């Protein structure tokens, strides 16, 4: 999975491209930790994410819980099978999807 970032005035956006699974979940966790060190408002753009596993979901919910109240994690452009997974697991309600 490739992760690119874009800084804006009040937000840092991470763009994910590929598959978020057991092998790549630690990569996202590290990228999110670094992002929240730089900015309190982080968006994760999933437009080019083809697949998400339970390991990837665990990273997103763990970071959401960790920053809740101290920062803001937004998930954007959730589509296709990734959206189906978010809805089936209830993560579409738990996470801040924009």
Regions found by a protein language model. Name each.
Residues 96-98:
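Short acidic-hydrophobic, aromatic-tinged amphipathic segments that line or gate anion-handling sites
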Residues 4-28, 47:
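STAS-typified acidic loop motif
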Residues 22-94:
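Amphipathic alpha-helical interaction surfaces in cytosolic regulatory modules
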């Amino acid at each position: 999975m490739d992760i690119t970032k874009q800084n804006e005035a009040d937000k840092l956006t991470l763009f994910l491209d590929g598959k978020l699974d057991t092998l790549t979940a630690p990569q996202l966790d590290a990228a999110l930790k670094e992002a929240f060190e730089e900015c309190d408002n982080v968006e994760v753009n999933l437009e080019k994410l083809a697949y998400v596993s339970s390991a990837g979901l665990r990273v997103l919910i763990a970071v959401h819980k960790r920053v809740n109240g101290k920062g803001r994690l937004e998930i954007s452009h959730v589509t296709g099978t990734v959206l189906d997974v978010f809805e089936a697991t209830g993560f579409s309600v738990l996470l801040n999807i924009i």
